[in-house]
Amino acid sequence: MPRLFSIGKGERKMFRWGEHLETLGNGVSVLVNETHHFGTDTILLADFCLPVKGKQAVELGAGCGAISMIWLREQPPAHITAVEIQEEAVDLLRRTVKYNEKEELVTVLREDLRQLQGKLPMGAMDLVACNPPYKTVGAGLVNAEEGKRIARHEVACTIEDVCLSAAGLLKYGGSLFLCHRVERMCDVIEAMREAGLEPKRMRLVQQRAEKPAKLFLLEGKKGGRPGLVIEPVLLIEDETGAYSGEMKRIYGSYRNEQE
């Protein structure tokens, strides 16, 4: 059993070695460790989903639950269900929810996202978000550590699994929000359409204006009519190499808390 320790005088909870709190701002924090943490893509996806206030929301493959916590920081949905298959990540997420005193707003479910029938109400959700593994099995080196392997490669679920799961959960007109690598764009669009989700809104993400896009954000609507809108490119940095104005807005109080 890992040793427990207090993270500071007056803190209400106890955490394990190797874990720390990322303070997102507005009184919301998320517990992370070396395996289960989050990056810029997660923050961009959480913002791309907004507004979520008053909605029934699901985060598939939630990991440490950063998307769910960012939603709570910005504009709380009516309820969030965070689905995650890995025991260690689920334990982290449950303690994060408890630390933030959000048990009434967030349900953490340890389940395989491919087997949610009977575990969650089908056709009842307003939105589903997922930051899926980007690499197919056989593409690149597979990490020996299980947690990192599941996060990076499609060993526990494929993009087709994610889209089918979301389609089952969503009500008619509900949306699935994804982020993915540009080289997988055709796979993602095809998987959405095969699941009955019509791609409606896309945004490319570039590090700087002169750099090629490596990431894209995509919204697919259940039962939506064909017609995809490509939004302006999201630039991470401006011409000086500093965060762009939009990135400063998206990071918001989170970045200020880290500095």
Region annotations inferred by a language model:
Residues 2-17:
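N-terminal auxiliary segments of SAM/dcSAM-dependent transferases
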Residues 15-56, 62-64, 69-74, 219:
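SAM-dependent Rossmann-like transferase core, predominantly class I methyltransferases
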Residues 29, 79, 105-107, 198-201:
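Conserved beta-strand segments of alpha/beta enzyme cores
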Residues 38, 156-207, 211-213:
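Conserved Class I SAM-dependent methyltransferase catalytic core
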Residues 47-141, 164:
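Conserved SAM/SAH cofactor-binding pocket of Class I
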Residues 132-161:
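Mobile active-site "lid"/loop adjacent to the S-adenosyl-L-methionine
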Residues 212-259:
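SAM/dcSAM-binding transferase cores
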